[in-house]
Amino acid sequence: MKVLGLIVEYNPFHNGHLYHLEESKKISGADFVVCVMSGNFIQRGEPAIVNKWARTKMALSAGADLVIELPLSCAMASAEYFASGAVRILNDIGIVDYICFGSEHGDVKTLDYIAQILVEEPESYKSFLKEELDNGLSYPAARESALKKYTAHSINIPQIISSSNNILGIEYLKALRRIKSSIIPLTIKRINNDYNTENITGSISSASSIRKYISTSNSTSFDDVLAMTMPKTSVDILFEEFSAGRGPVFKEDFYPVVTSLIRKMTPEQIRNFAYVSEGLENRIKSAADTAGTYEELVESICTRRYTKTRVQRILMGILMGVTSKDLDMLSRFDSPQYARILGFNSKGKQLLSQIKKKSSIPLVLKLSDFIKSCDPVLKRKLELEILATDLYVMCYKNPAFRKAGQEFTQNIIIM
């Protein structure tokens, strides 16, 4: 029995994801596929276009056997913590043989060599890094220069570490090395569209372009453009959600509530929230007082140091009330500590029986039972998860689906 692990967002599931899933199964020879998937908020600090249960259906319909949720504390974090949390889940459930990720570079040996340098930090690399930092370079620029010097320019470091999926892939490899995992890493070269391309140009287009198309087309029923770039099952599930009024959900939907919260605060109060430092509270306050849209709010806060993605994560943290104190408490743990099941099929049911025997972390099949037995830190982590969904559903078009507590009432998806 060979088990493949995939780390995904599926926002939404499209033909590129299908290619990745099928090719990953092919090159690994896997019999089963386990996905670790972000919940209702994703790594860029944005809401997913449809909820995690709908996206679980998309994954299972396309060939995944078991979907496990990546906790919010990892899902909406930097690439390093996102990757580390997801890898730990796949490692700790005790049954995964392979991890396969997409990358622009396509050569896992080169990416793993870079990961090895960054994890082991050989003395000469550290010396190069210190030299560049002393010369006034930012940490990312200093790291790039140190890697170039250490590898004697034998590989194209700038090209590799400037590509988003290469960066994430290196973080997966670093995480595997740090925990000395026996999971074998594989990569597939991404095809066609760039991760951040905003226009649909063919049968394989980026998730960003699909979300942009949905936001501007106002489609509420079957759509030929989406049918070209997404599997039919995904399109059907997407429009089932839209027709019910459970989406689409966009970051702009949060503009009124986020701005209202900030406008009621002083800069001193804003400073208490996670990752707010170095006077950023003043920029946040000023931006909230003047911005007329969510995009304007984000752009007004951004600096060279604070990227758009980082600012969006900070704003979502403010929305959810994540303080610096919370961050200190939650960061004491270097793993998610549990595996919450979102959905499975008949093959996934077989996997669950194996996980119950081999997992070093508890399986969560019923949240209401699990949360009663948690220590205070883990309970706080789950409370944030519950709150995130309670806030997410407030953006549904249909008021009938906006009730709080859906983390407790929504059933596991079984297909």
Swiss-Prot record:
Swiss-Prot/TrEMBL catalytic activity: cytidine(34) in elongator tRNA(Met) + acetate + ATP = N(4)-acetylcytidine(34) in elongator tRNA(Met) + AMP + diphosphate
Chief site of localization: cytoplasm
Enzyme class: ligase
Subcellular location: Cytoplasm
Residues reported in the UniProt entry to bind ATP: 7-20, 102, 165, 190-191
InterPro entries noted in UniProt: Rossmann-like_a/b/a_fold, tRNA(Met)_cyd_acetate_ligase
Domain of life, per lineage: Bacteria
A Gene Ontology cellular-component term: cytoplasm
Any one Gene Ontology BP term: tRNA modification
Record has tRNA processing as a keyword: yes
Enzyme Commission number, as recorded: 6.3.4.-
Keyword tRNA processing found: yes
Keywords: ATP-binding, Cytoplasm, Ligase, Nucleotide-binding, RNA-binding, tRNA processing, tRNA-binding
A molecular-function term among this protein's GO annotations: tRNA binding
Similarity field: Belongs to the TmcAL family.
Job description of the protein: Catalyzes the formation of N(4)-acetylcytidine (ac(4)C) at the wobble position of elongator tRNA(Met), using acetate and ATP as substrates. First activates an acetate ion to form acetyladenylate (Ac-AMP) and then transfers the acetyl group to tRNA to form ac(4)C34.
UniProt-recorded name of the protein: tRNA(Met) cytidine acetate ligase
